[in-house]
Amino acid sequence: MDNRIPYDDYPVVFLPAYENPPAWIPPHERVYHPDYNNELTQFLPRIVTLKKPPGAQLGFNIRGGKASQLGIFISKVIPDSDAHRAGLQEGDQVLAVNDVDFQDIEHSKAVEILKTAREISMRVRFFPYNYHRQKERTVH
């Protein structure tokens, strides 16, 4: 199954203005300098796999859905849970679960899929900007 989404189907998101690195940090030192970090790999999509025994909790909460037009986001991760150990964090956008697209899904349908699955393969990305916009809309 091809999980790529046509470019025209992506929502338009206006990001804050990019801030240039300080001029006093030489370009060859910017990657590892403690006052400037241009490492963006934390924002790339990643796969998180969880196994849930019958009757067990997933270890995280979600918010959002189709009504918010911003997607489904991880809103809470229980410390020391399997979800926490797998690397899920507040602000992760859930892109897909078990090959089901979560970018335009009703909240109730997303909850149903997550609660009924025993093995979960989630494609997520850390997207704090839209997560904070999501919280401002007070939908789920």
Curated annotation (Swiss-Prot):
One of its GO terms (cellular component) is pore complex. It is found in: Cytoplasm; Cell junction, Adherens junction; Cell membrane. SMART domains: PDZ. GO terms for molecular function: enzyme activator activity; transporter activator activity. PROSITE patterns: PDZ. GO terms for biological process: biotin metabolic process; pore complex assembly. Residues 47-129 form the PDZ domain. It holds the Pfam family PDZ. InterPro entries: MAM_complex_regulator, PDZ, PDZ_sf. Keywords: Cell junction, Cell membrane, Cytoplasm, Membrane. The keyword Cytoplasm applies. Mediates docking of ADAM10 to zonula adherens by interacting with PLEKHA7 which is required for PLEKHA7 to interact with the ADAM10-binding protein TSPAN33. Interacts with ATP2B1, ATP2B2, ATP2B3, ATP2B4 and ATP7A. Interacts with PLEKHA7 (via WW domains) at zonula adherens; this interaction is essential for the interaction between PLEKHA7 and the ADAM10-binding protein TSPAN33. Interacts with SLC5A6. This is PDZ domain-containing protein 11. It comes from Mus musculus (Mouse). The lineage of its organism: Eukaryota, Metazoa, Chordata, Craniata, Vertebrata. The gene is Pdzd11.
